């Protein structure tokens, strides 16, 4: 083992935060220094040259001050016996750089701790604070890291002696293995194996437990029900299916695959052909798939990997739909207990305690969103939608006074994608078909996730809890998805016959499911499974939940094609078996010469005992709202701080919202980029205005008063959120229903039944809406010992509805941004509560620690349908200036958020809403506020009346320029405050969370910027006509020069880049680095090269640096790139990850010696912003005739800060006029202030060019906003092409 010191690992503010945590834990630590240390396992000694190459390879990241380590060492490494994603990618890079004798690279974090002597207990406490026991180990000596490379002999299979010991043997195994088997399941297994005349193996029992867990089998939703002694006619699942039976319109696949599919649009899908690799549009049906999952249990144990693998698993579900599909846009949501932010505790937040084995709500909301965002970011899927609710209170509900809240959190992960018409249905698995595992190797992680998530937190052993959490490698999943993409793009020649993702239960669930669904059995070889931990037992190899894996059936004749695709994409795979005629599972183990599994499929997946739920209804006992202590002014401030209402920027800007170039409505609205969008919208392709939309609805606290009302409101809110897009008929909308319940808790089972019936049998059929997909999580309770007291925290019944719809025209989507530039205007409230104004279970009651008695509800189904249809007319006729639904916080919050988005004031009169101002302003009945032109008000009111809404419409007042927020009732002032003051209150929760998580200086700067009342918002100044197509004369000649669209494993922005060059008249060619390294392609035939954005090698060894070094340290490929850059007629562009990569190739690029490096953002966070830039005067041939132009652009990166050697280097860069783009603030001034400058680069620098102008590198993404509709905000006069299209046309013009 070789040990190589690395660079300092933590920035100054991270060290400060670590010292603060030590102080909070009463650990007397005076200083901490942390640096990376690398360990190389080599098969032969490295030569001096190879050693130098390895040293250079391991120099990466920002240049932080180094000092010799002093004090005691605590070395944090990956857990011995595991291989980290960092290790596999770093080893790949080393091999691609010619260091073939490196068997494996691994990285540790060496902490040098200074301070008074700590006792042994304190050292243990400090070690616990510095590492994640799930994934890491702590050593006190560098040599101890040798254990990382130790190899163990495989452990044998174990048998459970039921023939000798009978039932007791199974009962003991149930406890020891954490199987969560019910008594009747134990009886079933006893009968089955006794009938087979043999003892089961541990692997067979484990496989059965996972496949038949509540998590996988949904026993409660398929159970028979008796309520109050009355047999119920339907199961829960049958009531959900009733919606499809009533309205099957537009549904192509429901209830039988990894995701549901509905009809989409005929559009040009843009991808490279297999024959020549040239990108083009392919006119075909792009049907819409939809899926929403939860990952609650793992997120409670370890939030980052829990949320990351939640998103990763849901993405795999989408990709594994039909015979292979394309995930497109994602959503993430969280329900947690109270945050209790240190120094920002709120009056309604009481500490009720929690179990030690789960983390705090604050920890979940600090780490969980980062994990979910990081996976989506690295995979390359925009996260466009979400929700965030906190609830934790002692309330008087159905079961009397008890604790209700989300100690077991909800972590929601979902999204939509597209699929070809001929791939919607899975194919036939032929006898002899090869059974393949695509993706990463097996590791000893995530064991028992299905069974563990089916238990209430606190029932299982703490070690089993930790064992059941997986960890993530999104870059591997991206590689697998590229393989799936290449397969479905082959159309009828798609080699994939059948595909499933590997999730709960690992291969033990996925492979039996695959062959069973295909009507076959399977014969497998255990030792053919890719395995990074050879010491695992057969149970661990077969049942672990290592992520980023899919199982496929491939016809033998197509294996060569499949192998070729996988090799090009560097996606690992293994053929582990064959499909058999007999429906039998046989798993052979050639190492031990035995068969750990040998059982009929029907024992595993057959008719296990059906559950019966015999339950009792309980009546809600909510108390009437006590108003004595409620002041309206104080209520407003409290509600603005409540997370469900408060600004959620800290959850949004960490997530890429522009990748694909097909996002037309993200969370951020208008020139001031306020996060108040009601729904997410994507275009169906890069050549059309058809699209897809999705929205969320959930009102869980209402279930504490009325289960059915809560469910109805969730559906209603999803509809009011999506209503301001152009959908057409209501039945176009399809819903996902995610049900979370504490099954078995008094009253909850009957409440669940009532809620499902309300939606599945009544509301949705009446609206003609289908629920073709959903999921349930039935163990939403936490138990623990608090001193001498046994405590329970039970979540409210929680239904999260996600609405999906096909969109007729994405340009018609209306946002909450109030307009004061359209002449006189009118604000209308459409009150679907019809004056009920119920205050039970609202934000108001929550912030005053009450529940109330009567909640909101869907008051009139016909009016809800009429409302939707009326909005569709108004959207299609373009009569709406602004639209925002009423939800958490009520009418006052709706109006405030609209004013924030418009940076304006409102003056309204609520006299028509009754005499109870508190109820009028804070009820959360369904409804919306619309803004229309004053002269159209009468016509709009008539249209609403024609749709049955006459008694729901109230004229409120108008939006006005300025800072006023005035609410009156007749002549009485009800509430008056500055809009800017409300805006800051609304922002404070996000600010405090951001200060805790990121660089607090940046968080403070952002909060300070929100106080600038003179901020004009995003604005545009162009020095050219964006409607002029300067490439047109060259396109007319029909000569299409070739551009090499270069990608490395992990790159995710190549398709939209190709589309931009294609539109400018190029033939865009898909070139993978594996093509160049293998010699399949070279750069000689290209005049233009573009290196695309993403996460090459998952940013291991520095963003873009591993990619660059695989070029620099490969002599033939290095010469090829150098020759390209030295040809006087070539053009080269590097964007984001491609920019980072090319900046590290500067020694090969003439005139690039002054280029900087691009390193970790000053905020120490991934930054996704829509930022204003100005084109600087430079030689860049891409920016010709654009100098002086100011316009917004997509920014999405974690490492974009310009790093120069010193002041002289910066001066040389400036004096050479090589800066091509700079960040400016909304006043047009070059800035280093956050967030206008999202990465902290000196002088606002964000793009540089070579002396000749032929090579340009830039961190922002022009390719994601080359279409006007894909800009988060844009001036209304822009046409189809945004001004950024000029960059690509300049390139085409340059080539003549």
UniProtKB/Swiss-Prot annotation:
Keyword Nucleus in annotation: no
GO cellular component: cytoplasm
Disordered: annotated span: 304-323, 1000-1019
Residue sites binding Mg(2+) per the record: 678, 717, 721, 885
E.C. designation(s): 6.3.5.3
Domain Glutamine amidotransferase type-1: residue ranges: 1043-1296
Keywords: ATP-binding, Cytoplasm, Glutamine amidotransferase, Ligase, Magnesium, Metal-binding, Nucleotide-binding, Purine biosynthesis
Subcellular location: Cytoplasm
PROSITE patterns in the cross-refs: GATASE_TYPE_1
HAMAP family with a match to the protein in the record: PurL_1
Name under which the protein is recorded: Phosphoribosylformylglycinamidine synthase
Gene: purL
């Amino acid at each position: 083992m070789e040990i190589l010191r690395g660079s300092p690992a933590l920035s100054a503010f991270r060290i400060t935060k670590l010292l603060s945590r030590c102080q909070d834990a009463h650990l007397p630590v005076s200083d901490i220094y942390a640096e990376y240390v690398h360990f190389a396992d080599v098969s032969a000694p490295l030569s001096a040259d190879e050693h130098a190459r390895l040293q250079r390879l391991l120099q990466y990241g920002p240049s932080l001050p180094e000092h010799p380590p002093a004090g005691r060492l605590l070395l944090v490494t990956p857990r011995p016996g595991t291989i980290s994603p960092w290790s596999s990618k770093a080893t790949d890079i080393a091999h691609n750089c010619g260091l073939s004798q490196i068997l494996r690279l691994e990285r540790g974090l060496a902490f040098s701790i200074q301070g008074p002597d700590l006792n042994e207990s304190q050292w243990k406490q400090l070690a616990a604070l510095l590492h994640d026991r799930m994934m890491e180990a702590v050593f006190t000596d560098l040599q101890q890291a040798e254990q990382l490379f130790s190899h163990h002999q495989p452990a044998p299979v174990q048998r459970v002696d039921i023939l000798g010991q009978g039932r007791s043997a199974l009962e003991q195994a149930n406890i020891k293995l954490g199987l969560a088997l019910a008594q009747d399941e134990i009886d079933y297994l006893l009968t089955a194996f006794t009938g087979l005349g043999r003892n089961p193996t541990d692997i067979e029992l484990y496989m059965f437990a996972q496949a038949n867990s509540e998590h996988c089998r949904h026993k409660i939703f398929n159970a028979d029900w008796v309520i109050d002694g009355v047999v119920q006619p339907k199961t829960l699942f049958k009531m959900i299916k009733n919606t499809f039976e009533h309205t099957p319109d537009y549904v192509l696949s429901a209830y039988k695959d990894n995701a549901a599919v509905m009809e989409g649009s005929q559009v040009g899908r843009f991808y490279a052909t297999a024959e020549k690799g040239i990108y083009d549009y392919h006119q075909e049906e792009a049907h819409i798939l939809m899926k929403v999952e939860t990952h609650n249990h793992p997120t409670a144990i370890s939030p980052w990997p829990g949320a990351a693998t939640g998103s990763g698993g849901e993405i795999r579900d989408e990709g594994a739909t039909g015979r292979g599909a394309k995930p497109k846009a994602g959503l993430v949501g969280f329900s947690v207990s109270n945050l209790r932010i240190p120094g920002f505790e709120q009056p309604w937040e009481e500490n009720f305690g929690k179990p030690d084995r789960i983390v705090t709500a604050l920890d979940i909301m600090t780490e969980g969103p980062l994990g979910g965002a990081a996976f989506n970011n690295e995979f390359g899927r925009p996260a466009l939608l979400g929700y965030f609710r906190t609830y934790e209170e002692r309330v008087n509900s159905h079961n009397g006074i008890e604790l209700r809240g989300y100690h077991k959190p909800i972590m929601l992960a979902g999204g939509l994608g597209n699929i070809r018409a001929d791939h919607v249905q899975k194919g036939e698995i032929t006898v002899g078909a090869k059974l393949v595992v695509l993706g990463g190797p097996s590791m000893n992680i995530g064991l028992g996730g299905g069974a563990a998530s089916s238990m209430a937190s606190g029932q299982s052993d703490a070690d089993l809890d930790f064992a059941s959490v997986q960890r993530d490698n999104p870059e591997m999943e991206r590689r697998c998805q590229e393989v799936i993409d290449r397969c479905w793009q082959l159309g009828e020649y798609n080699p994939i016959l059948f595909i499933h993702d590997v999730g709960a239960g690992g291969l033990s669930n996925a492979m039996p499911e695959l062959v069973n669904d295909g009507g076959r059995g399977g014969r497998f070889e255990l030792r053919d499974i890719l395995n990074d931990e050879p010491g695992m037992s057969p149970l661990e190899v077969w049942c672990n939940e290592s992520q980023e894996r899919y199982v496929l059936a491939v016809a033998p004749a197509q294996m060569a094609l499949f192998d070729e695709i996988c090799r090009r994409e560097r996606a690992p795979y293994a053929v582990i078996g064959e499909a058999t005629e007999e429906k039998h599972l046989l798993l052979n183990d050639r190492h031990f010469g035995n068969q750990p599994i040998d059982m009929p499929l029907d024992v595993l997946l057959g008719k296990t005992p059906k559950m019966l739920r015999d339950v009792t209804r309980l009546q809600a006992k909510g108390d009437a709202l006590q108003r004595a202590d409620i002041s309206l002014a104080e209520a407003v401030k409290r509600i603005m701080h409540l997370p469900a209402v408060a600004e959620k920027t800290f959850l949004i800007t960490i997530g890429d919202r522009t990748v694909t170039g097909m996002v037309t409505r993200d969370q951020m609205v208008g020139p001031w980029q306020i996060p108040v969008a009601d729904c997410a919208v994507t275009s169906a392709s890069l050549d059309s205005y058809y699209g897809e939309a999705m929205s969320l609805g959930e009102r869980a606290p209402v279930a504490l008063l009325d289960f059915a009302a809560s469910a109805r409101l969730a559906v209603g809110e999803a509809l009011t959120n999506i209503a301001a897009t152009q959908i057409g008929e209501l039945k176009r909308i399809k819903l996902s229903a995610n049900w979370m319940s504490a099954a078995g808790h008094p009253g909850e089972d009957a409440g669940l039944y009532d809620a499902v019936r309300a939606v599945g049998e009544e509301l949705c059929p009446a609206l003609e809406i289908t629920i073709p997909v959903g999921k349930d999580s039935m163990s939403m309770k936490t138990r623990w010992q608090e001193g001498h007291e046994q405590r329970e925290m039970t979540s409210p019944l929680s239904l999260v509805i996600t609405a999906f719809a096909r969109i007729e025209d994405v340009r018609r989507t209306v946002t909450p941004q109030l307009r004061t530039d359209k002449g006189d205007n009118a604000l209308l409230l459409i009150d679907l509560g019809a004056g009920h104004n119920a205050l039970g279970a609202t934000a108001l009651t929550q912030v005053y620690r009450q529940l109330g008695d009567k909640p909101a509800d869907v008051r009139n189904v016909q009016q809800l349908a009429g409302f939707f249809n009326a909005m569709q007319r108004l959207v299609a006729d373009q009569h709406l200036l602004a639209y925002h639904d009423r939800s958490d916080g009520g009418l006052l919050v709706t109006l405030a958020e609209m004013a924030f988005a418009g940076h304006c004031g409102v003056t309204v009169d609520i006299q028509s809403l009754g005499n109870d101002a508190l109820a009028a302003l804070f009820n959360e009945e369904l409804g919306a506020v619309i803004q229309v032109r004053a002269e159209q008000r009468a016509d709009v009111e008539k249209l609403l009346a024609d749709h049955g809404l006459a008694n729901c419409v109230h004229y409120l007042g108008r939006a006005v320029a300025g800072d006023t927020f005035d609410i009156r009732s007749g002549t009485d002032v009800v509430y008056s405050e500055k809009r800017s003051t409300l805006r800051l209150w609304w922002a404070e929760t996000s600010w405090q969370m951001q200060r805790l998580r990121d660089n607090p200086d940046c968080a403070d700067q952002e909060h300070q910027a929100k106080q600038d009342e003179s901020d004009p918002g995003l604005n545009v100044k162009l020095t050219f006509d964006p409607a002029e197509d300067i490439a047109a004369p060259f396109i007319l000649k029909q000569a299409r020069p070739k551009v090499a669209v270069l990608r490395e494993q992990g790159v995710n922005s190549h398709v939209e880049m190709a589309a931009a060059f294609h539109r400018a008249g190029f033939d865009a060619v898909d070139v993978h680095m594996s093509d160049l390294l293998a010699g399949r392609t070279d750069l000689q035939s290209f005049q233009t090269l573009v290196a695309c954005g993403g996460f090459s090698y998952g940013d291991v060894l520095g963003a873009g640096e591993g990619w660059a070094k695989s070029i620099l340290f490969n002599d033939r490929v290095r010469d090829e790139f150098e020759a390209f850059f030295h040809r006087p007629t070539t053009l080269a562009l590097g964007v984001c990850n491609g920019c980072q990569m090319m900046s590290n190739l500067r020694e090969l690029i003439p005139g690039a010696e002054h280029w900087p490096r691009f390193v970790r953002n000053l905020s120490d966070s991934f930054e996704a912003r829509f930022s204003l830039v100005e084109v600087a005067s430079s030689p860049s041939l891409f920016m010709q005739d654009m100098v002086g132009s100011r316009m917004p652009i997509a920014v999405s990166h974690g490492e974009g800060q310009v790093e120069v050697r010193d002041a002289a280097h910066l001066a040389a860069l400036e004096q050479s006029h090589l800066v091509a783009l700079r960040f400016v603030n909304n006043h047009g001034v070059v800035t280093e202030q956050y967030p206008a400058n999202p990465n902290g680069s000196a002088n606002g620098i964000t793009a540089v060019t070579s002396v000749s102008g032929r090579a340009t590198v830039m961190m922002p993404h022009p390719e994601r906003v080359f279409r006007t509709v894909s800009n988060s905000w844009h001036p209304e006069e822009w046409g189809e092409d945004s001004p950024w299209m000029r960059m690509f046309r300049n390139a085409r013009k340059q080539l003549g």
